[in-house]
Amino acid sequence: MIAFLLLFPLALSAQTVFQHPWQGKKVAYFGDSITDPRNKASKKKYWTCLQEWLGITPYVYAVSGRQWDDIPRQADKCYAEHGDSIDAIIIFIGTNDYNNGVKIGEWYDEKDEEVMYGHGQMKKMTPRKRQYLCMDKDTYRGRINIALDKVKRLYPEKQIVLLTPIHRQNFHANDKNWQCSEDYTNQCGEYIEEYIESVKEAANIWAVPVIDLNALCGLYPMMDEHARYFNNAETDRLHPNDLGHRRIAKTLMYQLLTLPCAF
């Protein structure tokens, strides 16, 4: 008991002085309709919650309907308006690439080349295969490469965090915008899992952390019981409502504890 009483004030003190690493920081958000402040599915977005809870100043450049090929434009606009003054960037996009049937593609193009090499013997030109990042704007992985090449060159000293797309069910806006659920392949024959896995792979290719919201936030619109987290049970289980955004925000708040915001 004496030991407990002696240790408890120390523990209490440690809790009192602890500060979330993203507290009071300036964060740019790139993405699509789930992040776009003009989307009416919710009054509050996940970044609004983070603003309230952590005092984050949000700079939001997300636009509804956009795909990975729009990230360079969003990055340019952010840099033009704020320069190097932001602390970090969060990128949450990809569901529209799936819906629009963008081909997955490859991460690299491979070529036969020669390189100078010597190990235990005199150096000499040696035939090797060499990979080059694929910059194909018509493929998903090519678009991610183009985007991250742009963002990491613009912001070499900033934290860049990727978020995987969340699960999606039907979205029925009108007869010309009638999107089916994720248990169907898209026009190019791919399930959404391939698009999610590609974001995870990009983390290793580009040395950026990824938060797997698809798994961690718990939103699963395929079940009627989870319709409560989305805009409309019958017509829109793609866009989270206020309750859904709060759940995303709570997940992010705890996941971001493991990442520095500024270096």
Question: Where would I find each of the regions flagged by the language model?
Answer:
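Residue-level signal for beta-strand positions within conserved beta-sheet cores that form or flank
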Residues: L10, Q23, P156
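Bacterial Sec-dependent N-terminal signal peptides
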Residues: M1-T16
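Serine-esterase "nucleophile elbow" of acetyl-processing enzymes
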Residues: A14-S64, D69-S85, I89, D224-H226
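A generic, residue-level signal for flexible/boundary positions that often mark functional hotspots
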Residues: L6, A28, N232-E234
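Alpha-helical cap/lid subdomain in secreted, periplasmic
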Residues: W53, A75-F263
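A generic structural signal for short, solvent-exposed coil/turn residues
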Residues: L6, Q19-P21, L50-E52, K152, ...
